[in-house]
């Protein structure tokens, strides 16, 4: 008996561990303008909502949120909607978890959604044709994507963007574009899902066309959008650019100083050579001594090393001058 008791205890604890936490949903009553909560259970690892007996017939909208997203992802629990009941609502507010393809939510819908929340999904891209079926083109629509609310009540523009572009949604929350990349020529195509009541204006990057709506404050060109992106992209490089400019200025100043120094040095050396070195001796200096000779003009020159630096000077005496003059006579 003890073994049987222990067996049932372990069995009960194991079953209790598999009990799934409920998912909280709400339905909206437009008469009271109030949301009412109700719980939905998990059946065969699938959440089926809403149930026919849990939502009153006068409800005009539903909203279902993930109670524990981590729990759903770890246990591979998916959400399946009863699309037949969803068709009757005018304001459908849906939050999906773990969705990787928007076609999962688009299947079975016969009317356009007025509210769509895609924050808790791993969507790499959203197909344009499917999204156009889910949102209304002539009435304001809220669209949540990557934790950013994209939509305004006073702006009938709708968009979806690639997941990596979520940063730029903060810059232009009222301007909704789709960006498609072409791998061939690295060109980007911006597609306006709705411009006022006109569907689909397409522009290539760097073109100056723009989509003007009936709201004057929403008027922006594709070039302005690209300029905002480039500003955000290169904002972190500004300090490095400043440092490089300062270094180039310092190097230019150093080269200019060296050039001026070389020119000044050359100019000062030339001037000094003209003033102090006007006489450059080509032969060594000698001291002359006159020996007695019959012709003083042909006197022999003797070198005296002791007075080698004396100048070349020869001054005849008075007697020699007289002798020379008398001989000439």
From Swiss-Prot:
This is Transmembrane protein I329L. It is found in: Host endoplasmic reticulum membrane; Host Golgi apparatus membrane. GO terms for cellular component: host cell endoplasmic reticulum membrane; host cell Golgi membrane; membrane. Highly glycosylated. InterPro entries: LRR_dom_sf. The chain crosses the membrane at residues 240-260. It comes from the Viruses. Induction: Expressed in the late phase of the viral replicative cycle. The keyword Lipoprotein does not apply. Residues 32-239 are extracellular. The keyword Transmembrane helix applies. Glycans are attached at residues 32, 39, 44, 58, 76, 82, 101, 185, 219. The lineage of its organism: Viruses, Varidnaviria, Bamfordvirae, Nucleocytoviricota, Pokkesviricetes. Belongs to the asfivirus I329L family. Contains putative leucine-rich repeats (LRR) and a C-terminus cysteine-rich capping motif similar to domain structure of host TLR3. It is a single-pass type I membrane protein. Residues 1-31 form the signal peptide. Residues 261-329 are cytoplasmic. It comes from African swine fever virus (isolate Pig/Kenya/KEN-50/1950). Keywords: Glycoprotein, Host endoplasmic reticulum, Host Golgi apparatus, Host membrane, Late protein, Membrane, Signal, Transmembrane, Transmembrane helix. Viral TLR3 homolog that probably prevents TLR3 dimerization and subsequent induction of IFN. Inhibits dsRNA-stimulated activation of NF-kB and IRF3.
């Amino acid at each position: 008996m003890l073994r049987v008791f222990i067996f049932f205890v372990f069995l009960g604890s194991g079953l209790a561990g598999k009990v799934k936490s409920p998912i909280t949903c709400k339905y909206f009553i437009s008469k009271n303008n109030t949301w009412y909560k109700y719980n939905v259970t998990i059946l065969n690892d699938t959440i089926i909502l809403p149930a026919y007996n849990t939502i009153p017939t006068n409800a005009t909208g539903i909203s279902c949120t993930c109670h524990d997203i981590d729990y759903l992802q770890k246990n591979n629990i998916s959400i399946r909607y009863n699309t037949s009941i969803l068709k009757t609502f005018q304001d459908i507010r849906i939050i999906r978890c773990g969705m990787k393809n928007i076609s999962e939510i688009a299947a079975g819908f016969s009317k356009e959604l007025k509210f769509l929340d895609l924050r808790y999904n791993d969507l790499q891209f959203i197909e344009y044709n499917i999204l156009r079926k889910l949102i209304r083109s002539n009435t304001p629509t809220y669209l949540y994507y990557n934790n950013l609310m994209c939509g305004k009540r006073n702006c009938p523009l709708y968009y979806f963007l690639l997941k990596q572009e979520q940063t730029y949604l903060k810059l232009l929350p009222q301007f909704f574009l789709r960006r498609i990349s072409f791998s061939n020529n690295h060109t980007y195509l911006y597609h306006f899902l709705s411009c006022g009541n006109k569907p689909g204006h397409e522009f290539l990057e760097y073109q100056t066309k723009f989509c003007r709506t009936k709201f004057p404050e929403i008027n922006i060109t594709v070039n302005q959008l690209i300029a905002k992106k480039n500003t955000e992209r290169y904002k972190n490089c500004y300090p490095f650019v400043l440092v490089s400019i300062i270094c180039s200025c310092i190097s230019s100043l150093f080269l200019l100083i060296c050039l001026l120094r070389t020119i000044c040095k050359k100019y000062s050396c030339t001037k000094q050579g003209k003033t102090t070195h006007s006489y450059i001796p080509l032969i060594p200096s000698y001291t002359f001594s006159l020996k007695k000779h019959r012709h003083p003009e042909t006197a022999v020159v003797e070198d005296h090393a002791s007075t080698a630096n004396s100048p070349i000077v020869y001054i005849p005496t008075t007697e020699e001058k007289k002798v020379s003059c008398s001989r000439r006579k």
